């Protein structure tokens, strides 16, 4: 009996278009670099979580079942604490059925996009943006539409004009990140009010990415759900707030019908966020305040120091600076510049990962290594950013 030939193999086009890590082109070079690496490309912290909220602090005796399955929407004490936090700190009037604990904010956004966008429908994304959101929309079979924004818009009216110019009959949602990854900007309330009013007139969803809400140094963070609660899905994370990225715990809040649909998606992908991580998150909400206050000051100082050396405005929030490097490229492509930085051990993220209009920009995170390491990396980067001398 003849054996069948090799079947034709294919992968879904939507997933093939997602792309791999934005750092893939340099991965081998990074691994082979003989000296110290300054990892300014990763949005993370050098700090451990506060004592009492680390995995080593959790015991089975205190938390029976911490290594087992839990409620798919989140352990009840954490959900209760999140309801209280959202009501008091964010001023979002939620009930328990409007809160869903997820496998990180990344998992929460994936669930939300899957719940609100059908295949081929469009999600507007204010650019430059967090690198993963574009791939999340594509992976859920949606179409990301990039709206150059943070370096182009200077008023609430212009903000509305920018999103309106990119809207079509297939548009279903607008993604907004504030405080912004990668720009470090905090969107003013007047701008958010204008965008919320526009979304209401257009009958669109709003995806409000607020994972850096606890790191605001100038201005004031406003949750979009206070302006348009009936159409806003707000997403938060313990990764950034309390240095718990490895725990993979985030949460979303929104209208109960949308949250119910997002919950179904979550059950059939990750099932639920890690149980032990949720107990650590609860400890952070209860006892992590002093740690958060101390870290906020350290982050602010690191950001201001980096901005001063690089000749940039001080960040308003988050833990990033976004730099236009066109003046020093001199006809080269960005990959060559990144390789030159790597010669000094400095790794920064390519701006194209944050939007097609930003291929000649770079993002750096000033909290991904201890302050003395970041300071040295920034000094090395600053040398690479010096304009070429005439005749050189």
What are these regions (language model features)?
Residues 4-5, 230-300, 385:
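Conserved core segment of the aminotransferase class I/II
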Residues 84, 88, 164, 331-333, ...:
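PLP-dependent enzyme catalytic core of the Aspartate aminotransferase-like
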Residues 278, 282, 298-307, 312-326, ...:
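Conserved glycine-rich beta-strand-loop-beta hairpin in the small C-terminal domain of fold type I
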